[in-house]
């Protein structure tokens, strides 16, 4: 629960700043004291809307059932629209008497509201397919042009119309005709029973010639459930794994499987997100995490693709094994990524060394998928929900 407690403090600080600016703003107007108090009270209610909800959610509720999680997400969105978006106008009004500068502040606030609404209504489900080519002299020639599709972070419990959204995602994925699909964790947001029968049927639509391989993410292992009496976290996770197996997915639990072409093979290794990773899942340094047993029986000469929900484990992985391609998710680019020229700017840059897209070191590659779903607020700005299609190329064959 540490993540949530930290987030509450960040949002509380933001609300206090917003309330302070609102208070200064109201002081600029001539009005009766009673009317001034009413305005300040109204703005205080708006500015503290999410804070009250968050504290009720995380501190008072016996459990974080899906409806409470949804209320929390939408309350945060309301806070951003009603409180944060107002602040450009407040600041310009306080620092200048020039009507043009104040007008620019008002326009900025209107633009921010528009961006937030567009991120919720449009970008949230505006799926993008990113094509990535990986060339290696370690790839067997029989796997030249092999196509791997990556999905990550569906967070089904937060979807507004999950059956419709998943059916659309499955249709896009199937049209790409992948040889294999890799799912890198966080299928659900809170618990396994988000997988209603209609949603299970929608997920079963996903098809790939060599099957679908998946791993568990932090939301999949039920770390956000408080009430463990009715159904323990272990049992929730067991049922989630059983559901994925029912779809025909192969859940990799710190193990390696092989895909064969003629006499050649490539290895698919999956790292299960564990309780021991929970407290450090947003840390940039996970050097203390021990993965020594992960590749103990995996031949180093075999081309290897490793699935890891959190990208921070890449350094641990590559120090142990000549892993050729590591696929990760988790970060979502914090659902905000603004493109400026050739650069993408995101708040996730403050927390993560590697946060989105392709990274390479000494012919080893890491790809961080921006995910499909969302957490904390129901919108995406710039960071569109992503489906990634990899095409593997044999360097020796290319010659």
Label for each model-derived stretch:
Residues 113-138, 158-160, 164:
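Hydrophobic alpha-helical transmembrane segments in integral membrane proteins
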Residues 88, 131-133, 389:
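Beta-strand secondary-structure signal
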Residues 1-125:
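Non-catalytic terminal accessory segments
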Residues 141-399:
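Soluble catalytic domains of enzymes that build or remodel membrane lipids, polysaccharides, and related
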């Amino acid at each position: 629960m540490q993540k949530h407690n930290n987030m509450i403090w960040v949002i509380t600080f933001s609300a206090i700043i917003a309330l302070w600016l609102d208070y200064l703003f109201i002081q600029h107007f001539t009005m009766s004291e009673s009317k001034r108090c009413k305005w300040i009270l109204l703005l205080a209610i708006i500015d503290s809307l999410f804070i009250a909800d968050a504290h009720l959610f995380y501190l008072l509720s016996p459990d974080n059932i899906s409806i409470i999680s949804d209320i929390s997400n939408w309350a945060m969105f309301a806070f951003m629209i009603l409180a944060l978006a107002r602040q450009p106008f407040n600041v310009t009004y306080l620092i200048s008497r020039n009507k043009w500068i104040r007008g620019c502040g008002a326009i900025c606030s209107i633009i921010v509201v528009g961006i937030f609404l567009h991120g919720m209504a449009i970008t949230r489900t505006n799926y993008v397919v990113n094509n990535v080519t990986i060339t290696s002299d370690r790839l067997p020639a029989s796997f030249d042009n092999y196509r791997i599709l990556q999905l990550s972070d569906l967070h089904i419990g937060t979807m507004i119309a999950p059956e419709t959204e998943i059916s659309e995602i499955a249709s896009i994925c199937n049209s790409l005709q992948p040889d294999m699909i890799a799912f890198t964790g966080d299928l659900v947001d809170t618990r396994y029973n988000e997988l209603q029968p209609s949603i299970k049927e929608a997920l079963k639509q996903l098809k790939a010639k060599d099957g679908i391989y998946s791993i568990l993410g932090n939301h999949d292992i039920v770390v956000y459930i408080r009430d463990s009496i009715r159904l323990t976290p272990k049992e929730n996770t067991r049922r989630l794994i059983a559901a994925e197996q029912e779809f025909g997915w192969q859940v990799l639990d710190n193990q390696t499987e092989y895909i064969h072409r003629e006499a050649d093979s490539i290895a698919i290794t999956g790292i299960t997100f564990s309780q021991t990773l929970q407290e450090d899942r947003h840390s940039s340094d996970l050097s203390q995490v021990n993965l020594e047993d992960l590749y103990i029986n995996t031949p180093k000469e075999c081309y290897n693709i490793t699935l890891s929900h959190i990208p921070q484990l890449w350094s641990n992985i590559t120090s142990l094994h000549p892993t050729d391609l590591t696929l990760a998710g988790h970060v979502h680019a914090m659902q905000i990524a603004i493109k400026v020229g050739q650069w993408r700017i995101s708040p996730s840059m403050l927390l993560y060394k590697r946060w989105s897209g392709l990274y390479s070191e000494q012919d080893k590659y890491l790809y961080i998928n921006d995910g499909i779903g969302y957490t904390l607020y129901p919108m995406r700005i710039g960071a569109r929900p992503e489906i990634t299609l990899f095409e593997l190329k044999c360097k020796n064959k290319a010659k």
